């Protein structure tokens, strides 16, 4: 088993990773953001040298209309922890591949502010990591990658000295569940990076939406796009699947074939996450609250499937995801929720039977990101 400490140094250790957790009980002596601060301190996040370091806090701001996303108060607790140790935190996410309220940086910032995220409420700035149109990216080699050789990661994520994931743990219709690895891997991918993970092939033009503006032809470095009779078309013999045409199309006429298998999707997520965390100080926090059946990318959220469990933290994102999914599956389904009924002790597979969430954790473990073996320590 390969173990990585928070600085990325590798040791061959047959040991379980420590995952710390706290329930959601609170009283006049300590509110929940203060309890999260105590969790971070106890779990060792203060060991990281934050002095004069840029610290990216990766979270999901929530699609407008969705109410299951993490409240800004949680982000403020993390940002304050970093600032108190001399660091320079910022909240970040990358633009979405699909049409919605977060497909470019301006809409994304509007969505974040609509959902309560601002420097006033969180104590730090918001930076959309892959820029205005989702094409400000860095190609990062994936050590040991089988599916991805160079991950396309939002530049601001890679410019940060320290990386912290703050994850709302919930279900996901393709990955099975959305945990730390999903938040890091898919979330930190640029629009082209997201396409690479979701798509086994190359994009196509929905010609009924195309107006022949030519933006796609100008951005393509491989002469793979042509416009005839004011309609663009993509020559797949020339297309390399970089996704830049998707980013620049003002009409959202260039579409992805969402045709990657769920197992390969999960393995690509693991490889993208590896590219993000490899070789720098990282820490991971997941909140198992408001566990909705689907991703916070939806413009709505269904009722929570289980009772709220608590907050979890670890240097090991693999162990963290394993601990969180075990915690969810130990809970009874809430009456009337989507997971109600016989779940066979796997709520996420019950919700999304075609998914294969374990493949992500197994592949991340194989890549050396961490271990599924964990010691759960309650504070």
Where are each of the predicted segments found?
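Extended, low-polarity segments enriched in aliphatic/aromatic residues
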Residues: 9-74, 81-93, 98-379
């Amino acid at each position: 088993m390969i173990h990585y400490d928070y600085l990325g140094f590798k040791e061959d250790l047959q040991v379980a990773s420590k995952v710390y957790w706290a329930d959601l009980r609170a009283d006049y002596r300590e509110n929940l953001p203060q309890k999260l601060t105590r969790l971070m301190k106890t779990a060792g996040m203060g060991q990281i040298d934050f002095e004069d370091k840029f610290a990216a806090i990766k979270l999901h701001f929530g699609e407008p209309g969705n109410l299951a996303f993490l409240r800004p108060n949680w982000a403020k607790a993390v940002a304050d922890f970093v600032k108190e140790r001399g660091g320079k935190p910022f909240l970040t996410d990358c633009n979405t591949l699909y049409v919605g309220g977060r497909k470019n940086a301006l809409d994304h910032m509007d969505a974040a502010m609509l959902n309560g995220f601002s420097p006033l409420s969180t104590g730090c700035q918001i930076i959309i990591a892959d820029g205005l149109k989702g094409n400000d990216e860095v190609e990062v080699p994936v050590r040991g990658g089988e599916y991805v050789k160079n991950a396309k990661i939002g530049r601001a994520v890679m410019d940060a000295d320290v990386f912290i994931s703050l994850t709302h743990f919930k279900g996901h219709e393709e990955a099975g569940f959305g945990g730390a690895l999903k938040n890091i891997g898919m979330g930190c991918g640029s629009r082209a990076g997201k396409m690479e993970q979701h798509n086994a092939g190359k994009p196509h033009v929905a010609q009924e939406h195309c107006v022949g503006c030519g933006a796609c032809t100008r951005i393509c470095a491989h002469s793979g796009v042509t416009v005839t009779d004011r309609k663009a078309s993509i020559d797949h013999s020339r297309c390399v699947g970089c996704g830049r045409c998707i980013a620049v199309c003002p009409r959202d006429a260039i579409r992805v074939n969402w045709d990657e298998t769920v197992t390969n999707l999960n393995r690509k997520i693991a490889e993208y996450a590896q590219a993000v965390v490899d070789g720098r100080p990282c820490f991971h926090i997941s909140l198992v609250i408001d566990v909705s059946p689907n991703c916070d990318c939806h413009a709505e959220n269904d009722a929570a499937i289980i009772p709220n469990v608590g907050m979890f933290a670890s240097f090991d994102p693999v162990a963290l995801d394993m601990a969180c999914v075990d915690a969810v599956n130990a809970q009874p389904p809430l009456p009337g929720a989507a997971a109600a009924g016989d779940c066979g002790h796997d709520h996420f597979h019950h919700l999304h039977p075609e998914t294969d969430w374990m493949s992500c954790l197994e592949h991340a473990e194989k890549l050396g990101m961490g271990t599924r073996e964990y010691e759960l320590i309650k504070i």
